[in-house]
Amino acid sequence: MTTMPAQRANGAPTFKALLLAASALLPGAGWAGHALAADAPAAALAPDNADAAAVDALVVTARYRSEDVQTVPIPITALGGQQLEALGGTFNLKQLMQQLPSLNIQGFSGRNQTTTIRGIGTNAGGTNDGLEQGVGLYIDGVYRPRTGTAITDLVDVESIQLLRGPQGTLFGKNTVAGAIDIRTREPSFTPEWRGEVSVGNYKYLRAYGSYSGPITDNLAIRFSYLRNEREGLYYNTVYKKRWDNLDNNAYRLDLLYKPTDDFKLRVTADYSIQKGNMGFNVVTAVLPTTKANGSVVRGFYEKAASVGYTPLAIDPFARKIDLDNSQFDRMPSWGVQSRADWQVGGFTLSSISAYRDWRWIPNYDGDQIGANVSTQGIVDTVQTQFSQELRLVSPDERRLQYTAGLYYFWQEADDWTTSAYGRDAAKWLLGATYPDAVLNGLASVAHVVPATHSYAAYGQATWNLRPDLRLTAGLRYTYEEKTGLYDAKVGGSAVAIADLPTAWQALAITARATYAPVSRYEADWNGDNVSGLLSASYDLSDDAHAYASYSRGYKSAGINLVRQTTGVDIFVAPEKVDDYELGVKTRLLDRRLELNANLFWTTDENYQANYVNTTVSPAVTYIANTGTLRSRGVELDARAAPFSGLTATLSASYNEARYQSYKNASAQYLTSYQGVKDLSGAEASGAPRWTVAATLRYAKPITLAGGDGGEAYIGGDYSHRSHFFAAVNDDIFSLVPGYQVFGLNGGVRSDKGWDVSIWARNLFDEEYFNTLSVNATYGIVQGTLGEPRTFGATLRIKR
């Protein structure tokens, strides 16, 4: 791309300039493409080509056909197994986010993870089980509704594809923002085994082993085991030990039965458990005590003094914490799934069945500081799900190609929420003169049970009008039923009211009713929707393809299963998304350069977001509709092989995400959360304006000792994200600064199957935040930190 966007005085390109720059690719690509060579044979999903100065074709299966990614009229970023290995020290999707622009994952625990694409999805905040996810996560075709899956270890990954925009006519579960499609390696009838050991600083150890081979002539097996451990990245000054450690194990058993060329059955069972002293926030700043109107409130240091607590110095990147109560996370997960594929007359009929069980067993320090205010804040969760999908894919190479499917999904979560209060709670929360016994030992215990039944029929057809022109239409019908139970009671071992001094009894009754309210209700909802897709794609030449599309996405209504307070509605209206895409995909310079660009314009009506009601104590996290959100921008994907051995990739996104209509936003901290604020026209939360990811790799054939062939290689990666607001009300104290991270790796690979490398992530030890939250109750800003510099070595063996 030779045309540079016009710049503002401060260096930020205007939206109009970006549109013009991206649009300029269309005619240029059409002119250049006619002079290029004919299509080369497609290769398997692979990120580079060290043997020739040309970019390998990327073959993706997003539409359930093996297709050259350049001809698929969808904005896709794909990572292959070799590219994942080259990143070094990377083991989960949250870390891979750095290489997937437009994707943003925030959170601090296995349960509280939120995901957005282009600013649309689920914003940061306490996870609410009554809220559907806007980004679909699929592993081998099975939908994973729990966002905590994003931070678990990835095993046997063959490819990861990020599809942007609504995908309801392709996938079983409807999604409004896009989909993350993860595919794993099938069992092989040729015996093979893989082994990997990585060691690094912070006592990092990752050991992986996998064997695959035939049991009989038509039955193959793959068994894999992964161990991942690391000491903590933070030092707890109270417990005198390091926290935020990893203690993970994952097992996977895969069977492939293939009696004929026309039928195969794959059955997979997996189990993983993640453990550690993790899931906490650090204090990043102290909130001012003087508000915008000049009023003064009790601040963090005054409250701390009232209970005899001496806080640590505010220095988040010293990575010191003083949590004084036990904190741990246990996250076991297991599942069984089967996929049967029949091929009859060129048609493929697939059946995908899956049952999964996910549990979150935490014990959290409720206040996340060294005072004994909230001694416990947990949501013990058991989530189970079942899904069944039937899908028919028509033969390739026909004038009309189509996919049609039926889908059923059920999930239920069984949550037990506990908030317990300690000896400092009364003085901190109520006033310095209150006796400790007013709240000490009090606990609020709530049983929350949301359940969903989802039924859908979907289809998508492509009509090849001419060899160079295709029209695609898709339609989806969704019907969903939701139920919910919320049952809160008083628990704990607080002193009886009658045993308190008479002067405090009335105040204690009010305080306990506030912090441990009794409430019970049930709710149910049902509704349906029709959504769809229209697109056209045109071959400007053999090596240049343009497309335009419109799609409607839908996310069903939500149920607020929280303590009911003023302003909190039980039901949240469904979310509807209209998405427009205009893109071009090109191969240039005799296939040494692959350059793709697309413009997007997305309008999200009734955007569902996490709110925090801080006008009540304790604060209540709930979901509500913000109004209308608009996301528009430009995305760029490029791969290049300038000369033999050198490969480069670049993915970049400019996203202007704003609230178009948001007149009733929660007020911000400096206004004491009084009233509402009109944020119409303001930046949407969780949406960095700029995201960039780039990699560079050079490999050179060498002769090893003993005469064996091999190659030496070196590579680097770069990621940048600009600032964004973490809070839905754009509170200035939730502004997450932009950051950039570099990685480096290099090694030697033998033709005999071994590979030894060294690597570093966050090479220059960039200090950055993943997310920030405003905690007015404690008078502080809390956040989660990006990982510090990590480095190590890896040995891989493949046979």
List where the protein language model places each region.
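Solvent-exposed loop segments that connect transmembrane elements
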Residues: 233-242, 279-322, 365-376, 418-447, ...
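C-terminal beta-signal and adjacent terminal beta-strands/loops
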Residues: 4, 603, 719-727, 748-799
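Short loop/turn motifs that connect adjacent beta-strands in outer-membrane beta-barrel proteins
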Residues: 127-131, 187-192, 216-218, 262, ...
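Outer-membrane beta-barrel translocator/receptor signature
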Residues: 132-134, 146, 155-164, 169-237, ...
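Acidic, small-polar-rich N-terminal luminal/periplasmic segments of exported/outer-membrane proteins
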Residues: 53-190, 582
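N-terminal Sec signal peptide and the immediately downstream disordered periplasmic leader
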Residues: 1-90, 94-99, 261-262, 336, ...
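Gram-negative outer-membrane beta-barrel transporters
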Residues: 402, 467, 471, 596, ...
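Membrane-embedded beta-barrel scaffold of Gram-negative outer-membrane proteins
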Residues: 339-364, 539-555, 571-634, 639-641, ...
